[in-house]
């Protein structure tokens, strides 16, 4: 039997020589002509750039927004303001749906033929005019809805006044019934006294009783008049109290508010306790509520009690004066730092003790100050959540410390 020829070599079994031409022999037959020798022989590893994480919805987006129509920006609010008065006429009436489709007049196409160029130009040229007319009609419709809502409010107010008057009339009837009961008691009392006088059990006449009752009534009225005359001076004191005390109270309130604002922003410049963070990525602010920073910058963060209720954003300061929001996933929390006020208050007793021996202080002033600075710097970072075997400020699951 004749021996079979050996199989042809595989492409990966042949030795390729750089620069060799195409053919069955060795050579880069699979290489594209667009790839030059510099691309294959370029030394070094490819550089990998750090991609910043996605930014969570901004505060303005989290509060929600309204999708307003392009041609109806000023009149969409009337539907929510006067919807409580529910009018069936405005609910079923749509003056902009008379067979029009996007101001294209809902053409009936014959055999699906495209419209002519003249029709397209006419529609495009008249589109702005019809949009203006639509805006005017919307304005009149909004005014009519406002007048209808005003009429409903006035009518409801009038009905409320009538209901109050009706309740007062009913109250008058009830009072009349009560007073009639009092009159019945007086009549029974009069008959009882008259019976006692006729039987001789009561001495004195009815006239004397009436005079005595009248005298007591006059005495009570005189005492009330004297009390009213003596109490007429209180409006004057009240007037002067309002004139003098009003501005004073306003000034006190404003001064208290300014002090609170100043105290609430002392964390930005390091006077009060704050949290230190390092920027991991660059961030560019897009609104006045945010602040920009670059990777490696040190930021001061407000404490948890002063942080706004915005998910994924933190209140921070870069220069110690301007405060703003930053994305939480763009920074790394380092720890809590004590404010300068707290550090100074704690170092005051030590300074007083050192001043008791002035001769020994002169030689070690610089050394003590440097040691105090280093101690204060190291005591700055306080771990809030200690995890065994994790030197970083992140936990086992990679979550940052809670502010």
UniProtKB/Swiss-Prot annotation:
GO terms for cellular component: peroxisomal importomer complex; peroxisomal membrane; peroxisome. Residues 1-11 have a biased composition (Pro residues). Residues 145-233 are annotated as: Targeting to peroxisomes. Residues 272-336 form the SH3 domain. Residues 59-69, 344-364 have a biased composition (Polar residues). Component of the PEX13-PEX14 docking complex, a translocon channel that specifically mediates the import of peroxisomal cargo proteins bound to PEX5 receptor. The PEX13-PEX14 docking complex forms a large import pore which can be opened to a diameter of about 9 nm. Mechanistically, PEX5 receptor along with cargo proteins associates with the PEX14 subunit of the PEX13-PEX14 docking complex in the cytosol, leading to the insertion of the receptor into the organelle membrane with the concomitant translocation of the cargo into the peroxisome matrix. Interacts (via SH3 domain) with PEX14 (via SH3-binding motif); forming the PEX13-PEX14 docking complex. Interacts with PEX19. This is Peroxisomal membrane protein PEX13. It comes from Rattus norvegicus.
